[in-house]
Amino acid sequence: LKKNLLLSFFLCLALGPAMAQTNDFKVIGYLPYYRFAYNSQIEYERLTHVNLAFANPDMSGQLSLDGQDPTPVIEAAHQAGAEVFISLAGGALTPAWEAAWEHLMLPENRSAFIHQIMVYVAENSFDGVDFDLEWSHVNEKYSPFVLELRDSMDAHGLPLTAALPGTYRYPDISEEALAAFDWVNMMAYDLTGSWDPNNPGPHSPYSFALNSMFYWQGQGVPKPQLTLGVPFYGYNFGTSPVSSARYATIVGWDPANAWADQVDQVYYNGIPTIVDKTELALSQLGGIMIWELGQDDFSDLSLLRAIDETVNGVTQAEDELPLAARAYPNPLGAALIVENPGPEVLLGRLFDSSGRPLAAAIIQPGTDYQYPTLNLPAGLYVLNLQSGGVQRSIKLVKP
C-alpha cells in the first residue's frame, strides 16, 4: 500500500474513565470586564457559574469593575441558569488598587470594607464572592480578612471561593483561611509565559494539571472542593516580547489548529487536551474553571462547547466520525500502522509527552501510513484523526 505522511497524534493522559456528570460538578468561566462586549456570544447555558473579574475598591471601599456596568452580563447568565460571582482583586492590580487593598484590609478598616462588599453583592444580585488576591499582595492581612468575610458570607447564606496558583500555597494562608473557602479554583496554567522568554514551551500541559491536583490535595483540600483551571489562550514565543494569543485568534489562522497544542512557537490547549482535562476533572475533582470566556472561538471549534459536551457525555453520531480508519497494534510495537479505507482524507500530528511534534501527515483514501514506534519512550499517546471538520481520538500505549 502507498505510504503517506501522517496527521495527528495528541498526548492524552487520564487517571481513569470519566464519571457520569453529577449535579454538583461545576463549570466555571471567568469573564473580565474588558470582555463584556462578548456577552451576547457566550453560551451561558453551558456554565454553572460565571465569575465577573475583577472588582476593586477605591480608598473609601467603593467597588467597581473599572467603571463597567455588569448588569447585562448578570441578567444574561441568570436567564441561562448560571450563578454569577463577583471576583475580587486579580493578578494585575494598579498602584491605586494595591494601595486601597492594603488600607482596607487593616484591622481597623476591615469590618467596614466587608460591609461594603456585602452591599455591592446584594445590589448587583451576585450569588457569591471569589477572592483572587495574588502573590506579593497576599500578606499577614489575608487570612484574618478571609475569616471575617467568611462570617459575613455565612450570615447571608452565600459561598466564598478563591483562585490560587497551581502548585504554590502562599505562606500567609492559614489552615483556617484555606478551610474557609467553599472551593478552590486551581490556576493550572502560566507555567511559563511572557515573563520568562528564555523558557519557551507549553504553559499548561496535562502534567501540570495532575501536579496541581496532587499538590492541593496534599495541602488538605478535598477533591470535591477543587476545580481545575484551563486556559483559553496561549503564548507566542516567536515574538519579541513574548505575546499572548486568544484561542479564537489561533484557530482563526487555521481551523486545524483546534486539534493541536502547538503551532510554530505558539503554545496553548486545543480541543483534545481540553477534553482530556475535563475528563480528569470529572473523574477526580469537583469541577473545571476557565480563564477566560472572552478568548474562546464562538463556533463549532469552541472550547467551552467541548467542555460541555464532555461533561454531559455528548458525542457525535458514529457515522459522522472517520471510524473506517484503523490504527494498530495497541499496545504499540515496532511500528504504528494507520489504514484509511474510507473515501475521505485523514489529517493528524504526532506529539510526545512534552508537546513536541513528532510527525505530521495526510493519509489519502485507500492508503495507509506506517510510523516507526520501536524507539518511542514508554507512555501514553493519542492518535487524532480529523476528516471534514470532525475528529476522533484513539488512545495508544507504548509499554
What residue ranges belong to the model's regions?
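Low-complexity, Pro/Thr/Ser/Gly/Ala-rich linker/spacer regions in secreted
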Residues: 21-23, 308-324
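Conserved, mostly hydrophobic/aromatic
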Residues: 50, 86, 131, 184, ...
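Glycan-recognition patch characteristic of GH18 chitinases/ENGases
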Residues: 21-121, 200-207, 214
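C-terminal outer-membrane/trafficking sorting elements
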Residues: 320-328, 332-399
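Extracellular low-complexity, Gly/Ser/Thr-rich intrinsically disordered linkers
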Residues: 254-310
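Substrate-binding surface in catalytic domains of secreted glycosidases
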Residues: 28, 59-69, 115, 135-257, ...
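Short, well-ordered coil/turn segments that N-cap beta-strands
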Residues: 25, 48, 80-84, 125-127, ...
